Amino acid sequence: ASLVGSEMCIRDSYYIGNTSVYLTGYKGEEPTDSIVFPGMTLHYSGKKPGIRPGVLAKRFFYQKGQLYSQARQNFTQEALARLGIFKFAEFRYAPQDTLPGCDTLNVRMNATFDLPYDGELEFNVTTKSTDQTGPGAIFSLSRKNFMRTAATLSFQLKGSYEWQTNSTADGNSSKLNSYELGTSFSLEYPRLVLPWMSKKMMSSRFPQHTSFKLYASQLNRARFFKMLSFGGTVSYDFQPSRVWKHTVTPFRLAFNTLQHTTTRFDTIVDKNRSLKISLGNQFIPAMSYTFTL
């Protein structure tokens, strides 16, 4: 934050005046239009603001007419950074007038959007003591600021393949190939997404996070089984203070089903009941709560 024209009037305290936000596109597009809503004027490029005004306004912890506070300034900057959609954001303060007794500062925020997409491709090679080896890959793609809500929509696709490097006693290694395929989708918000919560409770000075996730995977273990798994979670994280953290998972579902088993696998699990239960068909709904201090 910086004070413009501070040489005009020096005071021990100031009040907040008008707030203007200038949003520059990730390609450098300068603002060409503006919209006025309570407490703020938003300048943007294109047909509509790059972020919904209501989402942005909840990150400002001061109002017009309030006494300027460094703490509110810090909370505001931290909340904007947690959105994860800006390459940078800066605040400038300027006296509302040039009179010697001026006690009001207008606020200007300049921000540039970050790139909307993040992508990652990872390769690996696995070698096991069971004489199986093979490659694997993970591809991840994230869309930031999804639907102008500062949410992140993510997609991940992973796969691996392993083959037997040595033949078995019967000289056949062609049937010993294992593979795994999986995909997941997640939608994450930097706030609590609860329709019954008041706007005041949702506008927190400390981090809040909501996550929705769906996943599915296909696992084939050579000479043993083929398993299909899928499930999903809904999770909330929030901090009422800097040191207290709550994690609430009201919904978690995991479903596993064996699509195919071999005689060898059936013989092994028949002798080990706990293994049979852990690898059998399962439908597991759950919920959890974690408190961190």
What are these regions (language model features)?
Residues 3-10:
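Short, small-residue-biased leader/transition segments that mark boundaries at the very start
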